[in-house]
């Protein structure tokens, strides 16, 4: 990807997710929301292997670093794709993260964090590619660890979902996590969004 293309893609992140010209059917909206609720449940109950099965082989899981800018530099609010990021993962690196999370030697998560993933404001768009959807959703992730450590992460996820015969109806092909915080005060980012 050229620098110009990366800059354009990054500038698109600050734009609101466009509403579809035609709303999707209530049935499809319901299916997508139910998928997200089940995904949140898997994460909150530390069922990481089942969650990993929801990721497509060509997954791109990306959380760009957000910076605070003045209005005229708003298009530079996110660090460009291909540069540093909180997460910039593919299927293999996500497998490594899951392996680490489920290991008994994972000190960052021993004892386990208690999390609650809340997903709302789900906007679904159909695409020209069959069985593929673009979805935006708002999230709030609450984490309590040890006795007094509390972290709250808020933001927007922009996903590409593909139809799948996996009992939940979809798999995640792309996830871009647009976190609201420019400075993350948590001790670590050992949670999935």
UniProtKB/Swiss-Prot annotation:
Q: What class of enzyme is it?
A: oxidoreductase
Keywords, A to Z?
Aromatic hydrocarbons catabolism, Dioxygenase, NAD, Oxidoreductase
The record ties this protein, via Pfam families, to:
Ring_hydroxyl_B
E.C. number, please? 1.14.12.18
**What pathway, per the record?**
Xenobiotic degradation; biphenyl degradation; 2-hydroxy-2,4-pentadienoate and benzoate from biphenyl: step 1/4
The processes (GO biological process) annotated in the record are: 3-phenylpropionate catabolic process
Q: What catalytic activity does the UniProt entry give for this protein?
A: biphenyl + NADH + O2 + H(+) = (2R,3S)-3-phenylcyclohexa-3,5-diene-1,2-diol + NAD(+)
Q: Name one GO molecular function term.
A: biphenyl 2,3-dioxygenase activity
Q: What is the documented function of this protein?
A: The beta subunit may be responsible for the substrate specificity of the enzyme.
NCBIfam families noted in UniProt: PRK10069.1
- Complexes and interactors: Heterohexamer consisting of 3 BphA1 subunits and 3 BphA2 subunits. A ferredoxin (BphA3) and a ferredoxin reductase (BphA4) must be present to obtain activity.
Q: Identify its protein family.
A: Belongs to the bacterial ring-hydroxylating dioxygenase beta subunit family.
What name does the UniProt record give this protein?
A: Biphenyl dioxygenase subunit beta
Organism expressing this protein natively: Pseudomonas sp. (strain KKS102)
Q: What is the lineage of its organism?
A: Bacteria, Pseudomonadati, Pseudomonadota
Identify the gene encoding this protein: bphA2
């Amino acid at each position: 990807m050229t620098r110009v293309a990366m800059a354009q893609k990054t500038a698109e992140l600050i734009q609101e997710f466009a509403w579809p010209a035609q709303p999707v059917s209530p049935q499809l909206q319901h299916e997508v929301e139910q998928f997200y609720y089940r995904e949140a449940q898997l994460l909150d109950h530390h069922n990481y292997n089942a969650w990993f099965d929801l990721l497509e082989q060509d997954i791109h899981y990306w959380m760009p670093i957000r910076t605070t800018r003045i209005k005229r530099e708003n298009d530079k609010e996110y660090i460009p794709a291909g540069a540093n990021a909180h997460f910039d993962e593919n299927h293999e690196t996500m497998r490594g993260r899951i392996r680490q999370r489920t290991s008994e030697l994972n000190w960052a998560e021993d004892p386990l964090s208690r999390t609650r993933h809340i997903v709302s404001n789900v906007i679904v768009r159909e695409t020209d590619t069959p069985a593929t959807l673009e979805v935006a959703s708002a999230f709030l992730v609450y984490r309590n660890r040890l006795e007094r450590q509390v972290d709250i992460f808020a933001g927007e996820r922009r996903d590409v979902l593909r139809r799948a015969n996996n009992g939940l109806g979809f798999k995640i092909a792309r996830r871009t996590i647009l976190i609201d915080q420019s400075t993350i005060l948590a001790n670590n980012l050992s949670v999935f969004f």
